[in-house]
C-alpha cells in the first residue's frame, strides 16, 4: 500500500528471521564489541589485500546468518548485496560460493537499508519465502577507493571519521520473529554543499525530514 510521498506500508509484513555481523579489530574494541557475532584479530582476515578481506567478511556474515537460522543457501530465493568498491567486487567474490541468485546494489552507506527494503518488498509481494540482504565496508579498501591508500601514510585530522570494517547479513522471510518490517521509506539525493571528505557524519545523519518526511 502506497503511503504519503515516498513510503510503502506492507499489508502482509515480512520478518527479520535472523542476522549476523562480522567486524574488524577496532570495532570489536568499541562499546558494542560484545554484540558482534565475529570480531577479527586483524583486519586482513587472513587474506592478502583489503578487498579480499572485505569479501571474506561478507561470506562469513552470510554463512553465520544462515547457520543461526539453520538454513542452507538453497533456502534463499534472492540475495540483495553490495559494498563500497567498484563493480561491487567484494560482494561478487564474497557470495560466489553460495550460488544464490543475486541483485548487486550500490548505495554507499545506504546499501544496508536499500538491501533490506528490497528484500522486504520482495517477500511482501510474494516473490519468495526468504531473501538474504548483505552489505560490507572496510576501512582499508574505502580509504584506497575514495581518499588516500593507507600505504601513502596521509595524516588524518583527529576529528576525521572512520569507515567501519564490518559486514552485516539479514535473512528476511515470512516466519514470525521479534522484529517485523511493516514498511519502507525511500530517501532522495540531497546536496547540502558539504566539501570535507573526512566529515562523513554530516552526510550520513542529515536528512530532509523537516521538508519531506513528515507524514510519510
Q: What does each model-found stretch correspond to?
A:
Residues 1-51, 147-204, 208:
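Condensing-enzyme catalytic core mediating Claisen C-C bond formation in acyl metabolism
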Residues 5-10, 72, 94-97, 111, ...:
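Solvent-exposed alpha-helices and their adjacent loops that cap or buttress functional pockets
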Residues 16, 50-110, 207:
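Conserved beta-ketoacyl condensing-enzyme motif
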Residues 32-35, 91-101, 123-124, 146-155:
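A glycine- and small-aliphatic-rich helix-loop capping segment at beta-alpha/alpha-beta transitions
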Residues 81-82, 131-137:
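Short beta-strand segments
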Residues 87-89, 139-144, 188-193:
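Short, well-ordered, mixed-charge alpha-helical segments that flank or form enzyme active sites
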Residues 106-133, 172:
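Active-site-proximal alpha-helical scaffold in enzymes
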Residues 205, 212-216:
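Single conserved hydrophobic/aromatic residue that forms the stacking wall/gate
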Amino acid at each position: 500500500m502506497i503511503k504519503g510521498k515516498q513510503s510503502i506500508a506492507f499489508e502482509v509484513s515480512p520478518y527479520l528471521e535472523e542476522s549476523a555481523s562480522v567486524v574488524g579489530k577496532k570495532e570489536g574494541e568499541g562499546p558494542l564489541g560484545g554484540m558482534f557475532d565475529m570480531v577479527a584479530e586483524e583486519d586482513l582476515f587472513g587474506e592478502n589485500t583489503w578487498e579480499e578481506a572485505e569479501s571474506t567478511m561478507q561470506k562469513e556474515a552470510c554463512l553465520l546468518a544462515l547457520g543461526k537460522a539453520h538454513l542452507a543457501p538453497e533456502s534463499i530465493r534472492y540475495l540483495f548485496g553490495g559494498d563500497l568498491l567498484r563493480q561491487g567486487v567484494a560482494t561478487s567474490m564474497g557470495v560466489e560460493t553460495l550460488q544464490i541468485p543475486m541483485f548487486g546494489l550500490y548505495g554507499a552507506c545506504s546499501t544496508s537499508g536499500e538491501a533490506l527494503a528490497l528484500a522486504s518488498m520482495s517477500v511482501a509481494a510474494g516473490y519468495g519465502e526468504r531473501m538474504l540482504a548483505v552489505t560490507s565496508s572496510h576501512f582499508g579498501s574505502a580509504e584506497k577507493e575514495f581518499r588516500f591508500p593507507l600505504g601513502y601514510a596521509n595524516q588524518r585530522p583527529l576529528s576525521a571519521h572512520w569507515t567501519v570494517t564490518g559486514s552485516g547479513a539479514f535473512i528476511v522471510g515470512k516466519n514470525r520473529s521479534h522484529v517485523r518490517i511493516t514498511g519502507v521509506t525511500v530517501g532522495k539525493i540531497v546536496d547540502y554543499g558539504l566539501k570535507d571528505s573526512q566529515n562523513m557524519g554530516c552526510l550520513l545523519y542529515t536528512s530532509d525530514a523537516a521538508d519531506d518526511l513528515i507524514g510519510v
